[in-house]
């Protein structure tokens, strides 16, 4: 089979298309014939060497969707031919096949395209964990989403609207703002405008914003507290810059006066119990149509380098996927 592998860390060009042996499942394992693989920003950080480095060569990717091709002994949750989305993989998903444990594959509704299945796990699980497990979001509250036209941003908007929240989202392009509005955000602002935070504050009303999903903390975090309502929460999902280059200053007194919380999160810290709740929500949302991942760009597997450049761009629009 063909697979993208990283033999050394560096720029996107290190993503190399290799011919490797087909995969065989062991006990409790499943081989999935890949129809689409999701591309996430974290994979660009690992590839470049600024995150913990896996042994090389390795195949990137933890998101994907396809059909079960083979199962190992003891597998009972899925059968050959089942449509599934992948939430983690033993072998990586930038490939024609992926090896997974039985618990890493989940039912993909017939109404969802494979590309949408490849776009569900990391963005939607991250948004769910940030909103409900870390941010303790509740119906009737107001959510502010920085960069709402990207994969996690869209997920946050859809999940929040389904939960009965008021949503204010940002995007820097007209196309992006239209997309955010189409996902159900009641208010959308242009975060390239100098006064966009003042506009957001006005839209939030006298009480302010209850929860902020922060995708670019090194740029925005110092200003976020001024938007918060009493006991408001900022959940930090993203921060760019190598090691200590992403530091910011905040006003502790502003946080004190609001009883505000700043909460960092990463999906890798989700507990098994968290993941059970997350996947129950995702499977149901895909089946009933309340969750509809938006695909921004599709690339052939051989163009993984271009896909990494696209997902690293500043003007996010939907999810980037690879098609083997």
Each model region followed by its residue ranges:
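Mid-domain Rossmann-like dinucleotide-binding core that forms the NAD(H)/NADP(H) cofactor-binding site
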Residues: 120-194
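C-terminal hydrophobic helical "lid"/dimerization subdomain
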Residues: 1, 273-324
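NAD(P)H dinucleotide-binding glycine-rich loop of Rossmann-like/cofactor-binding domains
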Residues: 77, 86-147
């Amino acid at each position: 089979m063909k697979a993208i592998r990283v033999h050394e860390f560096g720029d996107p060009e290190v993503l190399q298309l290799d011919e490797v042996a087909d995969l065989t499942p062991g006990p409790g394992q499943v081989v999935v014939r890949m129809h689409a693989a999701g591309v996430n920003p974290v994979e660009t950080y690992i590839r470049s060497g600024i995150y913990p480095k896996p042994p090389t060569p390795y195949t990137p990717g933890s998101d994907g969707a396809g059909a079960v091709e083979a199962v190992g002994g003891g597998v009972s949750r899925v059968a050959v031919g089942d449509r599934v989305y992948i939430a983690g993989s033993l072998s990586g998903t930038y490939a024609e096949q992926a090896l997974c444990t039985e618990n890493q594959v989940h039912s993909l509704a017939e109404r969802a395209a494979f590309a949408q299945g490849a776009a569900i796990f990391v963005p939607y699980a991250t948004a769910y964990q940030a909103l409900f497990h870390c941010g303790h979001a509740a119906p009737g509250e107001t959510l502010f989403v920085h960069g709402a036209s990207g994969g996690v941003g869209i997920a946050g908007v859809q999940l929040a609207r389904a939960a009965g929240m008021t949503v204010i989202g940002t995007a820097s392009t007209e196309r992006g703002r239209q997309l955010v509005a189409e996902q159900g955000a009641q208010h959308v602002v242009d975060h390239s405008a100098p006064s966009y935070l003042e506009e957001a504050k006005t839209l939030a009303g006298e009480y302010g914003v209850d929860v902020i999903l922060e995708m670019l903390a090194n740029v925005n975090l110092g200003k976020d507290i001024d938007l918060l309502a009493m006991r408001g929460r900022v959940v930090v999902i993203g921060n760019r810059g190598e090691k200590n280059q992403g530091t910011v200053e905040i006003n502790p007194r502003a946080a004190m006066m609001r009883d505000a919380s700043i909460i960092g999160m990463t999906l890798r810290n989700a507990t098994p119990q968290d993941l059970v709740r997350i996947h129950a929500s995702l499977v149901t949302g895909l089946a009933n149509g309340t969750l509809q991942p938006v695909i921004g760009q599709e690339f052939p597997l051989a163009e993984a380098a271009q896909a990494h450049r696209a997902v690293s761009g500043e003007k996010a629009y939907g999810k980037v996927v690879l098609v083997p």
